[in-house]
């Protein structure tokens, strides 16, 4: 299974929601006790960069007035930080990091999506999602997909009304490759 770059955010959203201070304070996060632990494969790195020129989420200050900085929220699969605003930091008894996301980056790989399709032989290229459900407590999610079946690197037939159901910890630990085509038109 390959997910096109502009659609990865739909799956990633469940992880990001579990990283916010509200979820942590309410004990409604499957990542609650996972800081410093492996939550994905070594290829799973999530960078929050508020200083990208013309980035949709760019800014010098966050919603609490703190100066922003680039952060590796997840690096090589290890959860480094949470999104904790000033209010939640006092409730949790920890230092604030930042209240929310800015520009999220999954670093690109070295190979094209076409090369990866050839390597896999047979699979589904997901190019859209239809609804989704993610449980921040458990990490379980399900999402409807649209896409195209590929065989030997060639797109063969469309696929619709199919579901993916998994757990975020399991899903992100199966990340095997990232293509070299980052999607820059989103925050």
PLM region descriptions:
Residues 18-19, 34-187:
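Dual-mode signal for accessory low-complexity, basic/Gly-rich regions
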Residues 2-35:
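Active-site pocket-lining segments that scaffold enzyme catalytic pockets across diverse folds
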